[in-house]
Regions:
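Long, contiguous N-terminal structural blocks used for assembly/anchoring
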Residues: 1-77
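Generic detector of leucine side chains in alpha-helical contexts
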Residues: 17-20, 45, 57, 82, ...
Length: 139
């Protein structure tokens, strides 16, 4: 049985201060560019990718204002977007920068939506719990 999901997000291990969620792929790549961790040719490639997205993907006002939101691509309408983002994922892999591809049908409370993406509100709360006893071999 194939699983189908409505939304996808690429994020890293780094936690964004304003959301307490993993930084998104654009944040991760820009940080690598700013920290000179990419060769110039690769930095230029990412800048081209980012420019393409700036031209083709609306920028949610909540993101412009650095509000605590997380953006997700819509899987059904974003084939071209996801094709373009694969090159940025390749750059992360080339520089051994870990990332996760997360799929969901429930990204949270949607505060912005366009043809290609949604932005969801985050509450700024990160819940950390102990493992349940069963994970320690106890019954």
């Amino acid at each position: 049985m194939a699983m189908e999901f409505k939304y996808v997000r690429i994020q890293g291990k780094e936690i964004a201060l304003n959301t307490l969620q993993g930084k998104g792929i654009f944040s991760m790549c820009w940080q690598m560019v700013q920290d000179d961790r990419m060769e110039q040719e690769d930095a230029d490639l990412f800048k081209e990718i980012d420019s393409w997205f700036a031209e083709h993907l609306p920028w949610p006002p909540q993101c412009k204002n650095q509000e605590p939101v997380v953006c997700w691509f819509k899987t059904e309408n974003s084939e071209e977007m996801l094709k373009m983002i694969r090159t940025a994922m390749w750059l992360l892999e080339k520089y051994k920068h870990p990332y996760y591809v997360i799929y969901t049908n429930d990204p949270g409370e949607i505060v912005y939506e366009d043809q290609y993406q949604v932005a969801t509100k985050v509450d700024g709360y990160l819940q950390i719990e102990s493992l349940q006893d069963g994970w320690f071999g106890k019954s």
